[in-house]
Curated annotation (Swiss-Prot):
GO terms for cellular component: cytoplasm. The lineage of its organism: Bacteria, Pseudomonadati, Pseudomonadota, Betaproteobacteria, Neisseriales. One of its GO terms (molecular function) is rRNA (cytosine-N4-)-methyltransferase activity. Specifically methylates the N4 position of cytidine in position 1402 (C1402) of 16S rRNA. HAMAP family: 16SrRNA_methyltr_H. GO terms for biological process: rRNA base methylation. It catalyses: cytidine(1402) in 16S rRNA + S-adenosyl-L-methionine = N(4)-methylcytidine(1402) in 16S rRNA + S-adenosyl-L-homocysteine + H(+). This is Ribosomal RNA small subunit methyltransferase H. It holds the Pfam family Methyltransf_5. It is found in: Cytoplasm. The gene is rsmH. It comes from the Bacteria. It comes from Chromobacterium violaceum (strain ATCC 12472 / DSM 30191 / JCM 1249 / CCUG 213 / NBRC 12614 / NCIMB 9131 / NCTC 9757 / MK).
């Protein structure tokens, strides 16, 4: 049987790479290689002395990246989560970089490959791991987690108002027989979510929540942001593409904190010119996909990109 081919459209492709303001001799990081759309465009803008290091947890993405690394000596791939950014770059002898790109969330090939268990559109083993070589599957977690933990995950990461009812139904069902497939979970959720948001399957929020939890997506995002910012050389840029409000909120709040001028009490006799300047500047407003891109790739509709740049100012006490 032939292996299915999945078309992956990279979201905000040119906008993200343009935001990095690529220097031909610079060192850049693509924290989420995926199928290499952003990485290939970055490489096309680098000169012979430029360098790109990419990260991914998905073995299928690593297979694609390995082929690219064999063709281009300027490119390195790291099979690890981006929360290991500082340690992995140190291992590669990289002390600072000129740009970091993060394209968060699950990729189109992962969603469209029914065997991965990310989507309720297919009947498949309930896996949801981005790295299928390690960790606990969604089915394994649902089989052992406390009802309260299931409820909290669905409520927090899915922003699902029916979390309590869904969690109770999951526990009741697993007492009869384990929930092992995407279809079983989707049907169960659909039976317990009475309202329907226009154009959205009732299982959408629950699947999102469990996927985020199984892959520790938000924890890893919180861990990598300060690492990426501190690795930037002066003038280096950080570009982060988010796909839902939970991710974007973390990015927005972190960048706001490190780009804010130092706050002093009103009575402090300090000239504005003498105040400590922030180590990070925000670059423009948040960027969204244009109408044409959304028409060609509906998944781009929820994408939002925030960009920041390292200043010459030193990191201040209290900066993350």
């Amino acid at each position: 049987m032939s292996t299915p081919t999945f078309v992956h459209r990279t979201v905000l492709l040119t906008e993200a790479v343009d935001a990095l303001a690529i220097r031909p001799d610079g060192v850049y990081v693509d924290c989420t290689f995926g199928r290499g759309g952003h990485s290939r465009l970055i490489l096309s803008k680098l000169g012979p002395s430029g360098r790109l290091i990419a990260f991914d947890k998905d073995p299928e993405a690593i297979a694609v990246a390995d082929r690219l690394a064999a063709e281009d000596s300027r490119f390195n791939i790291v099979h690890n989560g981006f929360e290991t950014l500082s340690a992995e770059l140190a291992r590669l002898g990289v002390a600072g970089v000129d740009g970091v790109l993060m394209d968060l969330g699950v990729s189109s090939p992962q969603i469209d490959d029914g065997s991965r268990g990310f989507s309720f559109r297919f009947d498949a083993p309930l896996d949801m791991r981005m790295d299928t070589t390690r960790g606990v599957t969604a089915a394994e977690w649902l089989a052992t987690a406390d009802e309260a933990d299931i409820r909290e995950v669905i409520k927090t990461y899915g922003e699902e108002r029916f979390a309590r009812k869904i969690a109770a139904a999951i526990v009741a069902q697993r007492d009869e027989s384990p929930i092992t497939t995407t279809r079983e979970l989707a049907v169960l959720v659909g039976q317990n979510v009475r309202t329907r948001e226009p154009g959205q399957d009732p299982a959408t929020r629950t699947f999102q929540a469990i996927r985020i939890f199984v892959n520790r997506e938000l924890d890893e995002l919180k861990a990598v942001l300060p690492q990426a910012a501190r690795l930037l050389n002066e003038g280096g840029r950080l570009a982060v593409i988010s796909f839902h409000s939970l991710e974007d909120r973390i990015v927005k709040l972190y960048l706001r904190d490190v780009s804010s001028e130092e706050k002093l009490p009103a009575w402090a006799m300090v000239r504005a010119a003498d105040m400590a300047q922030p180590p990070i500047d925000l670059v423009g407003k948040a960027i969204r996909a244009g109408d044409e891109e959304v028409r060609e790739n509906p998944r781009a509709r929820s994408a939002i990109m925030r960009v920041a740049q390292r200043t010459a100012a030193p990191w201040r006490e209290g900066d993350a």
